[in-house]
Amino acid sequence: MKPPVNQSCQHYPECAGCDRLHIGYEKQLQHKQEEIEKRFKGFKGLEIRQIIKSPKDQMYRHKVQLPFGHRKIGKKSVLTLGLHNKENTFIIDQKECRIQDEDLTTVAAAIRHWARNENLEPYHEKKGSGLLRHIVLRKANATQEILVGIVTNESEIPGRKKLTDRLYSYIQQFLYKENSKADVVGILQNVNRKNTKVVLGEKEVTWYGRHFVKEKIGKLDFQIGLSTFFQVNPFQIENLYNLILEDLPENKCVVDAYCGIGTISLYIASKSKKVIGLEENSSSIRSAIGASKANGIENVHFIKGKVLDTLRAALNENSDVVVLDPPREGLDAETKSILLNSKVNQILYVSCNPETLLRDAIELTKSFKYEKITPVDLFPHTSHLESVSVFTK
């Protein structure tokens, strides 16, 4: 294999965070365009549009999840904080990152410094022991607010008040040295005692400030917590959502399936007669309802429950259009069956996985015409690819 060219990160290619950093960005876009064209060329009459590049291709990630680890230096074990290597055998002690926001890299360095100075033990997955499991950091692009999450293996931590004060102090010092204008508005402890690969647990304790950052999409205000689903590349959100808006017919009843905190529902509300958002996560539904009230939007209604359990009833509300934004697994067979047998005239499908989109598109074209697909690069320097597809009757 040829050695990487244009290498611009000391951890590449060992780090598993990026897999295309050695390729120029324009060439990456070309490869992703070709991937979509090759994968979807079998659909007759399908318009495959040009990929939408990210306005920012470096330091674009405004959410960071990093595991704690340890490495041996002589006979001494030293705490590390970073990403897994590609073989998933150890944690790289991250010194830089070309895709995550600079302020979040600075905050991560401050947390590492704090953890080492306090002699806090990293979590040992095989033993199930140790305190520190992960950090989860979020930054709001509009307000420059930062939320810090420390995921622990224990609920009660002796001397928590002093630990919090010193952590906050270190973070402020590190940000000040970098002339950062970011504002740390909250430090949270998330407790996860399960032997699991899932990062966040269910219990959350506020150590300092509040449990969310304030973010904007266009003129809309949202509150983003540690576990909130929100696009990690804020520079592409409006480009993505405008594709939905562009093909959405005016004054129709719309079902927004997998709506999360209601970002799409509220973004398309001004063009719609009514929007029904479906979401199974209780916290997300509460946030969505709160956001609709805060933004003074009255033609959006949110229903808690799995899409499979709520979609049929929502479609009976004389719905004309369905917006889909499922997880990487795509749609289950029964959900597709409900859509195929519905009176819906249009489906707008936001996908983060071309493989499952292809599988679902083959099924959906039994009743719908696959009109167009627009790839959107939300994740430069990685193989991940988002897209918006339009299906009509």
Curated annotation (Swiss-Prot):
It is an enzyme of class 2 (transferase). Belongs to the class I-like SAM-binding methyltransferase superfamily. RNA M5U methyltransferase family. This is Uncharacterized RNA methyltransferase LA_0292. It comes from Leptospira interrogans serogroup Icterohaemorrhagiae serovar Lai (strain 56601). Keywords: 4Fe-4S, Iron, Iron-sulfur, Metal-binding, Methyltransferase, S-adenosyl-L-methionine, Transferase. It holds the Pfam family tRNA_U5-meth_tr. CDD domains: AdoMet_MTases (cd02440). SUPFAM superfamilies: S-adenosyl-L-methionine-dependent methyltransferases. Signal peptide: none annotated. It comes from the Bacteria. One of its GO terms (molecular function) is rRNA (uridine-C5-)-methyltransferase activity. [4Fe-4S] cluster binds at C9, C15, C18, C97. One of its GO terms (biological process) is rRNA base methylation. Its EC number is 2.1.1.-. PROSITE patterns: SAM_MT_RNA_M5U, TRMA_1, TRMA_2. The active site is at C352. S-adenosyl-L-methionine binds at Q231, Y258, E279, D325. The keyword Repeat does not apply. The keyword Methyltransferase applies. Gene3D superfamilies: 2.40.50.1070, Vaccinia Virus protein VP39.
